[in-house]
């Protein structure tokens, strides 16, 4: 049963351009949350996002983060807690680039374009009225 819930959560996350809420600690030490689009995912183990300069500054000070996917129809809540890092490798930035980013950045070489990699340490999944908590 546990693997079924995990598989369903992974399927939800893997949908193309899935939106979620990313919570980070701001420069004053307070939690902040914002919506962000997933670029690529390996199930619930890790996710990547593309972003501008604001989030990397906060991540460099405190790399603890949380990600939440939520929907009312179908009903689910996928909460992941872990660490997030800033990826600066140009080849990875090119790999993560997708249509629509040109509305915010000039190209993968844009110095204000960053890739973030979130790695899950623990999770709380509520899918199909079933809940599962766990750690990696």
Regions found by a protein language model. Give the residues of each.
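Short, basic/aromatic recognition patches
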Residues: 1-17
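A short, Trp-centered hydrophobic/proline-enriched beta-strand micro-motif
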Residues: 12-27, 65-69
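Short, basic and Ser/Thr-rich N-terminal targeting/leader segments
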Residues: 16-19, 31-34, 78, 109-112
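N-terminal leader/targeting helix
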Residues: 19-46
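Histidine- and/or cysteine-centered catalytic micro-motif in compact active-site loops
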Residues: 25-27, 37, 52-54, 70-72, ...
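Short acidic/glycine-rich loop or secondary-structure boundary segments that cap or lie
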Residues: 30-33, 57-59, 76-78, 125-126
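A short mixed-secondary-structure module that forms the rim of ligand-binding clefts
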Residues: 39-75
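Charged, gly/pro-rich active-site loop segments
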Residues: 79-136
């Amino acid at each position: 049963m546990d693997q079924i819930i995990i598989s369903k959560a992974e399927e939800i996350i893997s949908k193309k351009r899935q939106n979620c809420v990313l919570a980070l600690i701001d420069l004053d030490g307070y939690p902040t949350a914002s919506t962000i689009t997933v670029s690529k995912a390996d199930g619930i183990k890790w996710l990547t996002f593309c972003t501008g300069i604001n989030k990397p500054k906060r991540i460099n000070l405190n790399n603890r983060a949380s990600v939440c996917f939520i929907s009312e129809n179908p009903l689910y809540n996928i909460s992941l807690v872990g660490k997030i890092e800033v990826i600066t490798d140009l080849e990875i930035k090119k790999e993560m680039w997708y249509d629509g980013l040109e509305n915010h950045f000039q190209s993968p070489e844009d110095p204000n374009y960053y890739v973030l990699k979130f790695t899950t340490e623990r999770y709380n999944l509520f899918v199909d009225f079933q809940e599962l908590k766990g750690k990696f």
